[in-house]
A protein has these predicted regions:
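Short phosphate-coordinating micro-motif centered on Lys-Gly-acidic
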Residues: 1-13
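Long, Lys/Arg- and hydrophobic-enriched amphipathic alpha-helices
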Residues: 11-194
């Protein structure tokens, strides 16, 4: 639920990010995901001990408000075609936008959660052993190996989902190390803006 005046407070935080001196743009459009804030608050209220791992496509604040994204990140998908007009096929198309992982972290920390890790999907899956799973299949067994290798490539390739998708872990009183963040943890990218 949006508390009265909260939208203006959020906008005041974002405006300086979208209008940095080095940007030569007149208009900057951006999405504000108000429901994500409520979602993170509900996790913080429910979670007593442990970790929550979230995977989605998005960026930390510096990348999210880059001048290349001065028209926002919203994309529409209809029958394997992508475009940016939400009124083209209303009710029939998927409408998506990227996650501002710094905003997620800000709300999480403000609600008593800890940032336990942040990295790319590729690094997370490699840390969790995806390459070891593939190595169990003999390369000579092409009918099993090739489909699995193609699926893994889609998940970890920088040109596919590997770098665009990010993984963030938030928690309370978590005593266990999270293997997915042992190498390549980029939490510092989110913490520097806090």
């Amino acid at each position: 639920m949006l508390v009265e005046g909260e939208l203006f407070k959020i906008a005041e935080e974002i405006i300086p990010l979208a209008s940095l001196d080095n940007k030569n743009i007149e208009i900057y459009i951006s999405e504000i995901n108000l429901s994500a804030r409520g979602f993170i608050r509900s996790i913080a209220n429910i979670l007593e001990k442990g970790a929550v791992v979230l995977i989605d496509y998005g960026f930390g604040r510096d990348e999210y408000y880059h001048e290349q994204r001065n028209r926002g990140t919203m994309m529409c998908h209809y029958r394997h075609h992508a475009h940016d007009d939400p009124f083209y096929f209303p009710g029939l198309q998927d409408i998506t936008s990227h996650v501002d992982f710094t905003a997620i972290t800000d709300v999480a920390v403000g609600e008593g959660l800890e940032l336990l890790g942040y990295t790319s999907q590729a690094q997370f899956l490699i840390n969790c052993g995806i390459t070891e799973i593939l190595s169990r299949i003999p390369v000579e067994n092409t009918s099993d190996y090739l489909p699995m290798a193609n699926q893994m490539q889609k998940l970890v390739s920088p040109a596919e989902m590997g770098e665009l998708f990010k993984v963030i872990a938030l928690g309370k009183d978590n005593q266990q190390s999270l293997i997915g963040f042992e190498n390549g943890d980029k939490s510092f990218l989110l913490e520097k803006d806090m």
